[in-house]
Amino acid sequence: MEKVIIKIKTENAAFEEVGVGNELARILKDMADQLEDAYNFPKTLMDLNGNKVGTVEYE
């Protein structure tokens, strides 16, 4: 069985500045755009401030 694992840490300033829901939505929309354009799983997820906050794995 194949699966996608998305891990996102919500402990930094970007999530406090715009709210957890807003920042999660922005990150997931960005990931979705990358998938739609090239079926390319981003390995690293970045917050609004350019910090690494998560990973995507395809198994």
Segments (PLM) and residue ranges:
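Short, mixed-charge low-complexity intrinsically disordered segments
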Residues: 40-59
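Acidic, low-complexity, intrinsically disordered interaction modules
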Residues: 36-38
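N-terminal acidic leader/helix
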Residues: 1-29
